[in-house]
Design a protein with these regions (language model features):
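Asp-box/BNR beta-propeller blade signature and adjacent active/binding-site loops
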Residues: 1-261
Length: 261
């Protein structure tokens, strides 16, 4: 499940944990076969609406065949992972592939909507998997909402990209992959209006010579991507998720910004 804690005093104290994404015993399967992971939070800076995305895995697909396994019960020990083997497959159906869910709150996180399943409108049916990237999304200067996202292509190879909404979260669009064999990522809007995507590069696993974050930019909402000059050079990583944040501040009445990794 995906949980959330709220603080009303700047982080001095925290309210009890709320469960905000939970499919319970959906489809008459035990809760352990309705897990939700990879939470990503996004605040619409125009309306104050808070969005949280998560990846729902219903049931289990066979490691070798990728087919749905019937007759699962609380005592079943069968297990698979959406990023391993054939744990998530092409298609958009609930018994074919993991599902991309989004819930939202319009009262500062007190209550949350029933989740919207955007798998059908965003996932390329050839892709094996489409998922949020853990972390946070952003609101662009023009009001566009952007989630950092990730997936597995038609060959099962991972990629990173973005998913965005230009109508206040009513509909969502998936961009083209920014780079192959990358996964968890974070996005920022640069001062020129382009989007920078900072990505985990799985080529770095076990590699101690070249071990930096893959970095790409786009000026057309991810239709095309350009590798940044600092890609795999500036930011060292242990092949894991990481955060990128644009901090905007004023100095001598002049608006400035810095990127924090």
């Amino acid at each position: 499940d995906i949980a959330l804690n709220r603080s009303l005093d700047g982080g001095l104290t925290w309210q009890p944990t709320q469960i905000i994404l939970d499919k319970k015993n959906w489809g008459n399967l035990p809760e352990k076969f309705n897990g939700i992971s990879d939470a990503c939070i996004l605040v619409d800076e125009c309306t104050g609406t808070i969005y949280v995305a998560g990846l729902w895995m219903h049931g289990v697909l066979d490691n070798n065949t990728g087919k749905w396994i019937d007759n699962l019960s609380e005592n079943s020990t069968t297990w698979n992972h959406q990023w391993l083997f054939k744990g998530s497959q092409p298609g958009t159906g609930i018994k074919e592939t993991s599902q991309f869910l989004i819930t939202h709150s319009t009262d500062d996180g007190k209550t949350w909507s029933e989740p919207q399943n955007i798998t059908g409108q965003t996932k390329n049916a050839e892709w094996w998997l489409y998922a949020p990237a853990p972390g946070h999304g952003i609101t662009l200067k023009d009001g566009t909402l952007v989630f950092p996202t990730q997936g597995r292509d038609r060959h099962g190879v991972p990629f990173s990209n973005i998913t965005y909404s230009k109508d206040g979260g009513k509909t969502w669009t998936a961009s083209n992959p920014a780079y192959t064999n990358t996964t968890e990522c974070m996005a920022v809007e640069l001062n020129d209006g382009s989007i920078m995507l900072n990505m985990r590069d799985n080529r770095n696993k076990g590699n101690t010579s070249v071990n930096g974050r893959r970095i790409c930019t786009t000026q057309d909402m991810g239709q095309t991507w350009t590798e940044h000059p600092t890609s795999r050079k500036a930011l060292i990583e242990p092949t894991c998720m990481a955060s990128l944040h644009k901090h905007v501040y004023s100095r001598k009445k002049e608006k400035k910004s810095i990127l924090l990794f």
